[in-house]
From Swiss-Prot:
UniProt-listed GO biological process terms: arginine catabolic process to glutamate; arginine catabolic process to succinate
Annotated pathway: Amino-acid degradation; L-arginine degradation via AST pathway; L-glutamate and succinate from L-arginine: step 4/5
Encoding gene (name): astD
EC number: 1.2.1.71
Database matches in NCBIfam families: arg_catab_astD (TIGR03240), PRK09457.1 (NF006992)
Keywords tagged on the record: Arginine metabolism, NAD, Oxidoreductase
Record family assignment: Belongs to the aldehyde dehydrogenase family. AstD subfamily.
Name of the featured protein: N-succinylglutamate 5-semialdehyde dehydrogenase
Functional description taken from the UniProt entry: Catalyzes the NAD-dependent reduction of succinylglutamate semialdehyde into succinylglutamate.
Binding site for NAD(+): G220, S221, A222, S223, T224, G225
Catalytic activity: N-succinyl-L-glutamate 5-semialdehyde + NAD(+) + H2O = N-succinyl-L-glutamate + NADH + 2 H(+)
UniProt xrefs under HAMAP family: Aldedh_AstD
Active site: E243, C277
Highest taxon above the source species: Bacteria
Amino acid sequence: MTLWINGDWITGQGERRRKTNPVSAEILWQGNDANAAQVAEACQAARAAFPCWARQPFAARQAIVEKFAALLEAHKADLTEVIARETGKPRWEAATEVTAMINKIAISIKAYHARTGAQKSELVDGAATLRHRPHGVLAVFGPYNFPGHLPNGHIVPALLAGNTLIFKPSELTPWTGETVIKLWERAGLPAGVLNLVQGGRETGQALSSLDDLDGLLFTGSASTGYQLHRQLSGQPEKILALEMGGNNPLIIEDVANIDAAVHLTLQSAFITAGQRCTCARRLLVKQGAQGDAFLARLVDIAGRLQPGRWDDDPQPFIGGLISAQAAQHVMEAWRQREALGGRTLLAPRKVKEGTSLLTPGIIELTGVADVPDEEVFGPLLNVWRYAHFDEAIRLANNTRFGLSCGLVSTDRAQFEQLLLEARAGIVNWNKPLTGAASTAPFGGVGASGNHRPSAWYAADYCAWPMASLESPELTLPATLSPGLDFSRREAV
């Protein structure tokens, strides 16, 4: 029984599915997808639970969310292992994901009060009050790269605001989704407030096409995000929050500390085996001797990275990709760029056929035409050389995406120029592109999505503002508008 609908664990009636470890092929999870009728049942349960949940005092909703945080802390080691085994990422990195889930809860509570709480302004004859109200029933689509942390960034603020939810994890991480939902169950969520439906494309389409949804919160690929946007077009009454990744540039100016610049680049491009939406995909390196030295050192150090199993000792910097198919896709993207005229600086290599272990790849594309503007979700870094900083900014902005952008430079004036001209939601200076603060907005522009999911601004799209002019007394104004006559007329 792998679906949780209206407080009950039930068996899916759809396609049979199993999840294996992407490195060892060990079977981790088996179950059936939710069919369309079960998806509709989950929505009905959420709709029935909404009025009571929305009317709960905020303190009551907060108490359940904080109980969930305590359960995450108590079961941190177990959830870390589930995430690591299911995604292929090393244990150390999976542990940081669970820590981020815990920390995000306190931040979400603060954000609710700061961004969507009640505010009152006294007027001469009353008051103006701003309140916020939940949308109703929301669907949450989770990604596979952070299967606990990123859905958590939608689910927690949505529940705090008083919404009820249907959660569909990625079909590549059903085990993590189920494990997290079991902790929510133990936290004491009322039946129907949060429902779990497992499945792939058919389940997702059944969920996103429900007429009774009030909104959809999505983290994933641009292609799926665009599909959801088209599907919900002409329905302005539904909130749609999309985080769709990026084709992110990292600009490397001449710097004295080459090793520090290389370390920052490795953290930006190859952490999580390149499976972070903020990962650097395009490395823009200044022409000249220092740029040459930087690239040579980068190729040297990146070539030493050996991906390993989640539980290897010592721990590797990177583990496997989410699947062998994902690793193959990266290899195909590299070969495509070679065919276009790219010069390979470091060839990616499958550590073992049939697994998702893949070493990093680096390819120079300076002067190469028709390079696809796409997010290759893996450890493949594309390099361009530039002559001057204005050209670097032009190259950085030459994408339909706009998630993250970074600069490695000791020149503050260059960073100030980048802040003015970059088209990206996150612009970092001498910090990895993959570094983001949960107390700051997270998200981008263009094909990278809308709103700012999974962080401080998530409260904004989980509730709508209600403005009120209020007075406890009903009075006739001392001064009336022109043309109004309230004088008493004597009877004839």
